[in-house]
């Protein structure tokens, strides 16, 4: 099944004095949404390299310079990409930035308390422990996996770009409306694809799929790692192994950014099938306006294929 957002770009006359802002984005799904809103007017820059981990990334000097010089930075927030926070704080006061996690219209969910186990924190390093506490005592930052948030953000991005570039405000708005309609159609397709299998329990590599699961009513029985993909403790692995050995979990999913060895070890002898590798941030996809649809649609297809097998 292919999932494609068709973007009908509004045709507008060229305005001689229009100055399209340079836009920098943090992760592929945000980059895709901004690219759809900008359309033919400009191309946003993506910071997260292909195949990189959004939780643990280092900006190159050229990227830090791009952040410093950007007319607008659109990002999720420090809860997801703390490596971008310091670069943003170094920008001049009043420099334009749009943090999507903190946007009033963003639908948020908290990490489940079941995801925190005392053993995890007793056996991990101080640095990792601090990171786990930070990731799991607040809101789950994987907010783009709810397509409703994607639709809301398109409007926010268009408004912000229109404020910086009034001459092209109507184009940004038209592009955002077309893209939002595409996400709505995609959402209906995904819901129909997952409906026959949504009650079947699955386990994921890390706790990144709460928004996707809640939106589509999926039955996530647990995850190997916490929301920041830090190494799990022995007690956590033991509990999850017991869940798998009970025989109710049908599929366990690795991720493209992480070695599948631990998933294979956990699944061995349990009867749980190992599904295709999930890609919650789209790090394996070709960046561009179609990446958001490809991310959500591909995730749905991977889950459905394993549960139907």
Regions found by a protein language model. Name each.
Residues 19-309:
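Extracytoplasmic metal-acquisition and chelation regions
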Residues 1-4:
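Positively charged n-region of N-terminal signal peptides that target proteins for export
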């Amino acid at each position: 099944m292919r999932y494609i957002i068709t973007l009908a770009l509004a045709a507008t006359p060229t305005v001689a004095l229009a100055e399209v802002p340079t836009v920098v984005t943090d992760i592929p799904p945000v980059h895709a949404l901004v690219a759809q809103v900008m359309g033919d007017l400009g191309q946003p820059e993506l910071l997260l390299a292909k195949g990189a981990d959004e939780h643990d990334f280092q900006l190159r000097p050229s990227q830090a310079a791009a952040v410093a010089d950007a007319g607008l930075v659109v990002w999720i927030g420090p809860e997801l990409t703390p490596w971008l926070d310091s670069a943003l704080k170094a920008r001049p006061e009043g420099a334009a930035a749009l943090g999507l996690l903190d946007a009033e219209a963003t639908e948020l969910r908290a990490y489940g308390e079941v995801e925190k186990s005392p053993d995890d924190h007793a056996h991990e390093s101080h640095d990792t422990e601090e990171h786990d506490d930070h990731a799991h005592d607040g809101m789950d930052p994987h907010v783009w996996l709810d397509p409703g948030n994607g639709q809301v953000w398109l409007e926010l991005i268009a408004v912000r770009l229109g404020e910086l570039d009034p001459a092209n405000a109507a184009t940004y708005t038209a592009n955002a409306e077309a893209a939002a309609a595409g996400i709505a159609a995609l959402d209906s397709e995904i819901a129909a694809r997952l409906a026959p299998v949504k009650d079947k329990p699955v386990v994921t590599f890390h706790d990144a799929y709460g928004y996707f699961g809640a939106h589509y009513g999926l039955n996530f029985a647990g995850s190997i790692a916490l929301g920041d993909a830090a190494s799990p403790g022995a007690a956590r692995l033991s509990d999850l192994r017991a869940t798998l050995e009970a025989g109710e979990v049908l599929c366990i999913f690795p991720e493209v950014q992480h070695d599948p060895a631990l998933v294979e070890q956990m699944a061995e002898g349990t009867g749980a099938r190992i599904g295709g590798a999930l890609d919650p941030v789209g790090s394996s996809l070709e960046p561009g306006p179609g990446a958001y649809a490809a991310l959500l649609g591909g995730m749905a297809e991977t889950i459905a294929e394993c549960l139907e097998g």
